[in-house]
């Protein structure tokens, strides 16, 4: 994972609520054994509709997905997070996330930013009016700023998850940051346990 303090980008308005992981990436994509190539499966069913927002050329360079409430509900699948990231998104802003999806996001370096619905609606309106609207997510201050509409909103994040983003650590990285303590502990183990 890379260290993230500030995310600056443009957004894409996904005006849908209760988006489940099967809608994010259909189950037939889960048969793959490698961890790459999932971007083509992102919202695959919806992308058949030429009016679907991901097909709108105005948002081709968006790096922040702005969705409705209850994003990522349904079964746990890291593939959903991988598809979102591999498509080019660095963060998802929504009023709420399923717990499992939020945890999968933080473990894989995709920022899950929970804002109040009224703030999300203001961001939707801004990016629909101007696709170049800049969104700044500050992972240190835990704020989202959209200067063009004078919006600054704070979002919650558990301290250990904020620590992951600020320091670029996944589960293995966190474990390795304690390697001296682990080695010290292991050196005190009876030898019959190590043979």
Where are these regions (language model features)?
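Cytosolic catalytic domains that perform sulfur/thiol-centered chemistry
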Residues: 1-195
């Amino acid at each position: 994972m890379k260290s993230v303090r500030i995310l600056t980008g443009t957004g894409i308005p996904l005006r849908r609520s209760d988006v489940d992981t099967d809608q994010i990436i259909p189950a037939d994509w889960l048969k793959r054994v490698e961890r790459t190539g999932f971007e083509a499966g992102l919202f695959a069913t919806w992308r058949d509709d030429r009016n679907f927002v991901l097909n709108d050329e105005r948002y081709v360079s968006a790096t922040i997905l702005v969705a409705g409430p209850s994003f990522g509900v349904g079964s746990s699948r890291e593939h959903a997070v991988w598809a979102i990231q591999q498509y080019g998104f660095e963060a998802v802003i929504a009023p709420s996330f399923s717990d499992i999806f939020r945890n999968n996001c933080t473990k894989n370096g995709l920022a899950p930013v929970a804002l109040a619905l009224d703030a999300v609606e203001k961001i939707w309106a801004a990016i629909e009016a101007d696709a170049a609207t800049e969104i700044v997510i500050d992972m240190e201050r835990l704020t989202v700023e959209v200067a063009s509409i004078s919006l600054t909103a704070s979002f919650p994040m558990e301290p250990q998850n904020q620590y992951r983003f600020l320091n670029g650590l996944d589960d293995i990285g966190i474990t390795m940051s304690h390697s001296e303590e682990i080695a010290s502990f292991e050196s005190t183990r009876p030898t019959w346990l190590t043979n």
